[in-house]
Amino acid sequence: STDWDKNKELGIDVPVISHESGQRCIYPNFKEIPNFTGPVQARNFEVYRDSLKAHGMLDQADDFYQVSGAQTVLEYKDVIEAQLRTYLKSGFQLLSINDFTGQGYAPVGILDPFWNSKGLITPEKFREFCAPTVALLRFSKRSYYNDDVFTGKAEIYNYSPSALKNAKFKWWVTDADGKVLKSGKLKTQNIGNHGVFSAGEFSYALNGITAPQ
C-alpha cells in the first residue's frame, strides 16, 4: 500500500528531518575494481569476487548486480515518496547517492564511489520521484486480482517557487509490455505550493486483464 504517511506522529512544534533514509545495499560491481588506482584498493571487492568464484557462480555476478540494483532503485523510490507524502516532515537525507567507502563499505548508492552512474537509473527518472514537484499516487494494496477495481488517489507534492496554474493531469494503466489498457484525465485545476495537494482520484476495473502482469 502507498495509502499511508506519518503525519499523525509529527504533530510537534519542532522540525523533523529523516536521517539516512534507505541505505539499500547493491551487489558489488567487479568491473569497478580497475578504477581503484590510488592508496585505497578494492580489497573487499576482491574478497566477494573470489568467494563467488569458489562457489562456481562468478558468471552470475552481473546478474546479481543488476537485479539488486533494480530492487534498490524501487525501494528508494518507495521510501522517498513516503517521505514526500508526509507533508509535516521538514525534510529527509540519504546516506549518500554514491557508494560509501569509509569505515568499512556501504554499496548503497545509485552512483559508484567515483560518482559515476551505475547504469541503474537516469537522472531524469530519479527526479520523477525526488524533485521540488512530484506526482504521487495513493493506492490500497500492491497485489490485485482481475475481479478487483483499482482506485488511485492522486496527490501533488509541490515545493517549487510557485503554484501550478491550470494544471492538467492524465493517468494511464499499462500492461507488462507497456501497452496502454486504459487512460483518462483528472480535472484541470490550480495546485498550491509549499505542501502536498489532492488532485483527484480514478478507478479502473481489472476484469479485462487475463494474465499476471
Q: PLM ranges: what are they?
A:
Residues 150-156, 201-204, 213:
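Buried hydrophobic-core signal for structured, non-transmembrane domains
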Residues 167, 212-213:
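Exposed beta-strand face motif in extracellular beta-rich ectodomains
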Residues 180-211:
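Intrinsically disordered, low-complexity Pro/Gly/Ser/Thr-rich segments with frequent PxxP/GP/PP motifs
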Residues 2-166, 170-174, 181-183, 189, ...:
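Substrate-binding clefts and catalytic carboxylate motifs of secreted carbohydrate-active enzymes
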Residues 146, 211-212:
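Surface-exposed loops/turns
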